[in-house]
């Protein structure tokens, strides 16, 4: 993580189901140290870090003897909280971004407003219930938890795709790329809050 960055935060969250520790640096270079016990999910979070350039450390222990649900959802909660904490008042950020991202057979669009208002629009249809041992429905559960706790409006639209691994990966990469743009410091706004309300607290 960069020595100059002040947009850093750490969150620890423990329940009877999971124990999560997350650290982020919004002005990083996409370094990651991620261990959740869920291999496919680790791979997706690595994509999120690498392509957003947010340095991430995620250590999660959960009740995987039951299933992956609590671990994935609670990681989304903690990661969202860490990003919200690192953003503070959200001064000087670009705020908005959208893009379509191609990955082989798949095209996925993501749009974000780092507004302080939490909302998820999800237009994705996986054609199988699992990718390996990972439940595909947990991709939505992660982004629902992430958006609600980061305080962002997030729209995710998979336009087409035949391979479910590619669909999932394109979602994480597309979200990463719009976060990279929206969380950047805008040199023309400096310390201004990018809202006519004067606040991005929701």
UniProtKB/Swiss-Prot annotation:
Keywords linked to the UniProt accession: Amino-acid biosynthesis, Cytoplasm, Histidine biosynthesis, Lyase
Keyword presence, Amino-acid biosynthesis: yes
Residues making up the signal peptide according to the UniProt record: none
Gene3D superfamilies in alphabetical order: Imidazole glycerol phosphate dehydratase, domain 1
Pfam families per UniProt: IGPD
NCBIfam families associated with the record: PRK00951.1-5, PRK00951.2-1, PRK00951.2-4
InterPro entries: IGPD_sf, ImidazoleglycerolP_deHydtase, ImidazoleglycerP_deHydtase_CS, Ribosomal_Su5_D2-typ_SF
Listed transmembrane segments: none
PANTHER family according to UniProt: IMIDAZOLEGLYCEROL-PHOSPHATE DEHYDRATASE (PTHR23133:SF2), IMIDAZOLEGLYCEROL-PHOSPHATE DEHYDRATASE HIS7 (PTHR23133)
Native source organism of the sequence: Brucella anthropi (strain ATCC 49188 / DSM 6882 / CCUG 24695 / JCM 21032 / LMG 3331 / NBRC 15819 / NCTC 12168 / Alc 37)
GO term, biological process aspect, one: L-histidine biosynthetic process
CDD domains to which the protein is assigned, alphabetical: IGPD
An example Gene Ontology molecular-function term: imidazoleglycerol-phosphate dehydratase activity
GO cellular component terms given for this protein: cytoplasm
Official protein name in the record: Imidazoleglycerol-phosphate dehydratase
Lineage of the species this protein comes from: Bacteria, Pseudomonadati, Pseudomonadota, Alphaproteobacteria, Hyphomicrobiales
Pathway the protein contributes to: Amino-acid biosynthesis; L-histidine biosynthesis; L-histidine from 5-phospho-alpha-D-ribose 1-diphosphate: step 6/9
Record's subcellular location: Cytoplasm
Domain of life per record: Bacteria
Name of the gene encoding the protein in the UniProt record: hisB
Catalysed reaction, written as an equation: D-erythro-1-(imidazol-4-yl)glycerol 3-phosphate = 3-(imidazol-4-yl)-2-oxopropyl phosphate + H2O
Keyword Lyase: yes
Protein family according to the UniProt entry: Belongs to the imidazoleglycerol-phosphate dehydratase family.
EC annotation from Swiss-Prot or TrEMBL: 4.2.1.19
């Amino acid at each position: 993580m960069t020595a100059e960055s002040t947009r850093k935060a750490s969150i620890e969250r423990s329940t009877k189901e999971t124990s999560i520790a997350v650290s982020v640096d919004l002005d990083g270079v996409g370094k990651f140290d991620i261990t959740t016990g869920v291999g496919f999910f680790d791979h997706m979070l690595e994509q999120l870090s690498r392509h957003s350039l947010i340095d991430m450390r995620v250590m999660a222990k959960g009740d995987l003897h039951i299933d992956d649900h609590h671990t994935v959802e609670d990681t989304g909660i903690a990661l969202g909280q860490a990003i919200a904490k690192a953003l503070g008042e959200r001064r000087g950020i670009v705020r908005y971004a959208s893009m379509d991202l191609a990955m082989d057979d798949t095209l996925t669009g993501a749009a974000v407003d780092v507004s302080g208002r939490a909302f998820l629009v999800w237009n994705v249809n996986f054609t199988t219930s699992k990718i390996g041992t990972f439940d595909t429905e947990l991709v939505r559960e992660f982004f629902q938890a992430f958006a609600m706790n980061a305080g962002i409006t997030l729209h995710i639209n998979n336009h087409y795709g035949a391979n479910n691994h590619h669909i999932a990966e394109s979602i994480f990469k597309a979200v990463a790329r719009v976060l990279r743009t929206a969380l950047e410091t805008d040199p023309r706004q400096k310390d201004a809050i990018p809202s006519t309300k004067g606040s991005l607290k929701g």
